[in-house]
């Protein structure tokens, strides 16, 4: 399993990406078995030291590819631009930066990217922050787009405009996986803008679709 790891230090934190292995797929020893595979990004021109997260990994031929959501400030700008970062590995433990894609027109932080192929076309699902700022709609949404993607170079380009998967916050941070029958199944985070006043939690997972 791959996930984001961020130890707190005086209410500040740095974001690393880690791998953890389980013999049965259910039991994980998070204290002893996790291994940092991507250290915090210190190059501000590449990504954000804190807000780089949500790894998704797949295998292509004899190589693994990892996609991350992040943001950075372009030269000459004072605003963040959302982006995805690509890393590759031969053994799933030693990773190297490969490529990136960004678009300043699509929000200012790209969360939970998921890139996959359907009928010879690549689909990108992600959840940009501050995508809409009209005062009427939620600023964060889950969107999708057909993209051009080369597995060898990890060169990606959004071919068309992004489209909202579902309106509102009832579906956010959506991710897909393949079931045992070969179907691609999507599950998201169903949440509301603020937590209930008498509870310590917010949201739940959606039904698979």
Functional labels for PLM-detected ranges:
Residues 1-54, 59-107, 119-167, 188-209:
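Beta-rich carbohydrate-recognition and catalytic domains
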Residues 50-56, 111-114, 172-175:
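Beta-propeller and closely related beta-sheet repeat lectin domains
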Residues 173, 183, 209:
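Glycine-rich, aromatic-lined ligand/substrate-binding cores of catalytic
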Residues 179-180:
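Structural secondary-structure packing elements that flank or coincide with functional cores
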């Amino acid at each position: 399993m791959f996930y984001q790891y961020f130890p707190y230090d005086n209410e500040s934190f740095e974001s690393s990406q880690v791998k953890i292995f389980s013999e049965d797929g259910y039991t994980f020893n998070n204290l002893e078995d996790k291994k940092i595979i991507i250290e915090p990004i210190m190059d501000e021109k590449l990504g954000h030291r804190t807000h780089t997260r949500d790894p998704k990994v797949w295998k292509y031929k004899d190589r693994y590819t990892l996609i991350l959501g992040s943001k950075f400030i372009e030269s000459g700008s004072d605003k963040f631009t959302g982006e995805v970062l690509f890393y590759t590995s031969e053994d799933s433990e030693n990773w190297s930066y490969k490529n990136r894609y960004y678009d300043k027109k699509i929000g200012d932080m790209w969360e939970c990217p998921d890139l996959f192929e359907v009928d010879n076309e690549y689909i990108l699902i992600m959840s940009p922050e501050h995508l809409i700022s009209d005062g009427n709609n939620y600023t964060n949404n889950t969107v999708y787009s057909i993209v051009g993607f080369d597995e060898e170079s990890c060169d990606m380009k959004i071919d068309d405009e992004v489209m909202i998967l579902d309106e509102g916050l009832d579906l956010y941070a959506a991710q897909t996986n393949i079931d045992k029958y070969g179907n691609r199944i999507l599950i998201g985070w169903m949440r509301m803008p603020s937590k209930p006043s008498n509870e310590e939690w917010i949201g739940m997972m959606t039904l698979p679709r």
